[in-house]
From Swiss-Prot:
Pfam families: CBS (PF00571), CorC_HlyC (PF03471). One of its GO terms (cellular component) is plasma membrane. It comes from Rickettsia rickettsii (strain Sheila Smith). InterPro entries: CBS_dom, CBS_dom_sf, FAD-bd_PCMH-like_sf, FAD-bd_PCMH_sub2, Ion_transp-like_CBS, Transptr-assoc_dom. Despite the presence of the tlyC gene, the true SFG rickettsiae are non-hemolytic. This is Hemolysin C homolog.
Length: 299
């Protein structure tokens, strides 16, 4: 497990305190307003008036206001973690097995628990509950550690979801499709990030640094979920148009094959581009290596 120095911990604590102060200061007039009305339209009216009178606000405060205004039109579908990226544990797993699984596979503080298939999520556990149970030598199954989640549709507005999470006192929502199957996942952190900006933990920082790396003039390593436009800008070549039904590099690859390709598969995208699958599951692409036969910008 990674350990941070006292100096790093102090720096993080100061940053968190500054963020908390900023949010409290900014939301004070909003909180007071909601004591008088529950109308969403009036809520955004308050936000807009705050933005107009934002000359004395800091950059962080103005950014939060801008994010709040954008929240008016955003739905769960815009931010949810897709089904293929959900980390979950079977209900039949015992506590010792779960402890090892979380250490090796699941870098999050909360983990979904399902019965049979991912379409039957029964709740989630918090890692602190797990380690507390292990420390007190509790044995058995997971049921006594499971916390409740809520169910939401992809079309639900983010502000409505935030209010529902607060009412239900839970931090996780399972997004279901029209047939009741699990479509995705949204956490309270996802919603907060939409308002105050991205909140990175150590795992996020590792993923971000590996998302898109230009190794040399002819090789790029990329997360399959990086947008195609990022690659187009780097190589100076158009790879898709407005009529294509994909946005990511992984989507680009899948248009050339009939199923998710195995690790090691190489696919010619154009005369200059070959993409090799370097990480994948049976359901989705994770990472690819992009080879530029003519080098960057044909050099």
């Amino acid at each position: 497990m990674l350990k941070s120095s006292k100096k790093e911990d102090s720096s993080k604590k100061n940053q968190n305190n500054k963020l908390i102060f900023t949010v409290r200061k900014l939301f004070s007039p909003i909180k007071n307003f909601f004591r008088k009305t529950k109308t969403p339209d009036n809520f955004f009216g308050v936000i807009k008036r705050l933005k107009i009178n934002s000359q004395k606000m800091t950059l962080d405060e103005r950014n939060i206001l801008a994010n709040l205004l954008e929240l008016e039109d955003k739905t769960i579908e815009d931010i949810m973690v897709p089904r293929s990226d959900i980390a979950a544990i079977k209900l039949t797993t015992n506590l010792e097995e779960l402890s090892e699984s979380i250490k090796l596979e699941v870098p999050h503080t909360r983990t979904l628990i399902y019965d049979g298939t991912l379409d039957n999520v029964v709740g989630f556990i918090h890692i602190k509950d797990l380690f507390k149970a292990l420390a007190t030598k509790q044995n058995g199954r997971l049921k006594k550690l499971i916390r409740k989640h809520i169910i939401a549709a992809p079309s639900m507005k983010l502000l409505d979801l935030l209010a529902k999470m607060r009412r239900e006192r839970t931090h996780i929502a399972i997004v279901v499709d029209e047939y009741g199957g699990t479509d995705g996942l949204v956490t309270i952190e996802d919603l907060i990030e939409e308002i105050v900006g991205r909140i990175d933990d150590e795992h996020d920082q590792q993923l971000d640094s590996d998302n898109f790396k230009v190794i040399n003039n002819s090789t790029i390593i990329s997360n399959a979920r990086v947008e195609v436009e990022v690659l187009e800008e780097i190589i100076g070549e158009k790879l898709h148009n407005d009529y294509d039904e994909f946005d990511t590099i992984g989507g680009l690859v899948l248009t050339r094959v009939s199923s998710v390709p195995a690790i090691g598969t190489r696919i010619d995208i154009s005369e200059n581009i070959e993409i090799e699958v370097t990480d994948a599951t049976p359901r989705s692409l994770k990472q690819v290596k992009i080879r530029l036969k003519n080098g960057l910008n044909g050099q």
